[in-house]
């Protein structure tokens, strides 16, 4: 590989040459912080990823949480354009051009953006570090470049990333995680989240007090949860994890990070305890939803000392939910609060995958508080410590997203990204979004692919097929829809328990899908080998045990490889 490619350029045109070490088949680049003290922006490795229109190959960059997949950029004719995005789920990208075939791995101690450009018939890809926002220069920038064979496939790049992380102990196989009973159970059976109570979201009362707090709507009481469990049993659902959302004081997002006491309008503490015991007695598992990142002023645990401080010296208000304006809690304080609040929750005798909201779906905030400064690297370390602490306390751990720094001890992610849940994102540099995350991490953790694939049986044909092709764990949600006048990122069609007919319909649907999934559950333990985009809208997921799943993403019947595949249908073969 040509080392002249291993340079960076600052905003003044200055060229930065890294220290280079060759080790274990990789090039390790270090851009030393001492050389970056007066730099505002740094364009990283701009010479490494360039290709003329019409060239063979591709760039592959990771999705962020607003996207429906990872960006496969092929060098087809396009008008000049540029596309920039940041906060990616994975911290690596792939370059395959006539000159270079490499996996590029970026240490996650800074926030950075991907910039993909097409200009004068040339495609280019670089990452940009902006030291005027988020983190100032405080550490070296470290990048690993892994040379790949010239004909490397998506599966080869995924396998390289997975194997390196396994060897270094950054992740562990799902087979290892399944030695915990709750995780093995989750592998075989669906998740059923139940949103119980909430105030209007977003709330018209931005700064809530005990005097002006809006009414909480008690939609599913603890007694009603027992009815749902009975209906599941009556419909023959052999196993399920019921996860209660909005069980806490003032309901979902109502007073976070305050949890206790359980909301009286739902039945209070005694009814919660009764419900936990009841669900377990039926042979199901049960867990609760908590949140350490959001803080609203009405919480009895609220303190401004917990809140993230921006580079401008302002408290970081991020989110507008049932409790009004929410402020993000510094990672250092999130861990403190988890250790303060979660032991009381753990004493309730829960036996499912405890759910801490948000922590695995965002890159940790940069906090510039003088009392508790926390830059990205420290934030990630503290997030990992929080996940570890919570997992050891409850026995298993789940969260909202699947950021790669969280995966070692994340047993299940509610969705890899929001997909098109907030609307389709226009990405002018590609027309192909691929499941590179799933290709890399299937067999490492359980996940649901996107927020629209929650409640997948009642969603669009594309959502249902996406769920299957990307290897998801069945994930259902009673009352997923709760936002007023804003997008509901899990969709506008829903499962509800407002009357017995609706509840029993949902239970019957879950029973059918649980039975179908039973024959696929063992495949969760198997790595994906490749994911191929064929002609005629056929996509193929290939597993390392020889299993192949062919999906027809079109409205027309397709003949492929000796198989007839119905519109939006699929075929499994070995």
Model region roles, listed by residue range:
Residues 1, 35, 161-168, 225-233, ...:
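Hydrophobic, Leu/Ile/Phe/Ala-enriched alpha-helical segments that form helix-helix packing faces
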Residues 24, 35-37, 48, 248, ...:
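Residues that cap or initiate secondary-structure elements
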Residues 96-155, 211-213, 299, 306-322, ...:
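Active-site-proximal substrate-binding groove within the catalytic cores of carbohydrate-active enzymes
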């Amino acid at each position: 590989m040509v080392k002249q490619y291993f340079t960076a350029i600052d905003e003044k045109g200055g060229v930065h040459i890294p220290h280079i070490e060759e080790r274990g088949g990789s090039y390790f680049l270090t851009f030393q912080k001492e050389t970056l003290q007066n730099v505002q922006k740094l364009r990283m490795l701009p010479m490494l990823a360039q290709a003329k229109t019409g060239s063979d190959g591709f760039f592959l960059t990771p999705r962020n949480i607003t996207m429906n997949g990872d960006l496969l950029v092929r060098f087809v004719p396009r008008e000049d354009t540029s596309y920039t995005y940041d906060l990616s789920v994975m911290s690596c990208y792939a370059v395959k051009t006539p000159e270079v075939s490499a996996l590029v791995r970026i240490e996650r101690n800074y926030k950075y953006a991907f910039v993909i450009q097409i200009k004068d018939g040339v495609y280019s890809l670089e990452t940009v570090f902006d030291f005027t926002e988020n983190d100032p220069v405080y550490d070296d920038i470290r990048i690993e470049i892994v040379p790949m064979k010239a004909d490397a496939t998506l599966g080869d790049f995924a396998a390289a990333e997975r194997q390196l992380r396994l060897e270094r102990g950054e992740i562990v196989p799902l087979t290892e995680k399944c030695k915990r009973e709750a995780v093995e159970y989750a592998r075989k059976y669906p998740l059923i989240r139940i949103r119980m109570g909430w105030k209007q979201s977003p709330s018209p009362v931005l700064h809530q007090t005990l005097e002006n707090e809006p009414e909480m709507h008690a939609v599913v009481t603890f007694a009603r949860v027992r009815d749902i469990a009975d209906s599941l049993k009556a419909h023959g659902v052999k196993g399920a994890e019921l996860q209660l959302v909005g069980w806490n004081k003032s309901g979902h997002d109502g007073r976070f990070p305050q949890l206790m006491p359980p909301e009286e309008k739902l039945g209070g503490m005694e009814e919660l305890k009764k419900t936990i015991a009841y669900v377990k007695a039926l042979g199901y598992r049960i867990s609760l939803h908590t949140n350490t990142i959001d803080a609203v002023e009405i919480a009895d645990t609220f303190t401004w000392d917990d809140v993230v401080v921006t580079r401008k010296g302002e408290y970081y208000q991020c989110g507008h939910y049932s409790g009004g304006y929410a402020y993000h809690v510094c990672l250092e304080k999130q861990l403190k609060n988890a250790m303060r609040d979660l032991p009381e929750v753990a004493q309730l005798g829960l036996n499912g995958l405890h759910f801490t909201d948000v922590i695995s779906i965002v890159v940790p905030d940069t906090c510039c508080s003088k009392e508790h400064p926390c830059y990205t690297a420290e934030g990630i370390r503290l997030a990992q410590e929080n996940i570890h602490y919570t997992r050891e306390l409850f026995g298993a751990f789940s969260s909202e997203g699947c950021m790669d720094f969280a995966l070692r001890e994340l047993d299940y992610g509610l969705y890899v990204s929001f997909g098109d849940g907030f609307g389709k994102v226009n990405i002018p540099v590609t027309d192909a979004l691929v499941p590179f995350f799933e290709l890399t991490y299937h067999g490492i953790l359980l996940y649901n692919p996107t927020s629209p694939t929650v409640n997948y049986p009642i969603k669009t044909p594309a959502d249902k097929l996406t769920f299957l092709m990307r290897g998801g764990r069945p994930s259902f949600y009673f009352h997923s829809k709760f936002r007023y006048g804003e997008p509901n990122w899990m969709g506008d069609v829903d499962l509800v328990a407002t009357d017995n007919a609706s509840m029993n319909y949902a239970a019957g649907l879950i029973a059918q899908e649980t039975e179908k999934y039973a024959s696929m559950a063992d495949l969760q333990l198997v790595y994906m080998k490749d994911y191929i985009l064929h002609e005629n809208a056929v996509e193929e997921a290939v597993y390392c045990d020889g299993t192949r799943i062919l999906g027809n993403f079109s409205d027309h019947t397709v003949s492929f490889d000796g198989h007839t595949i119905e519109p939006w249908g699929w075929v499994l073969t070995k």
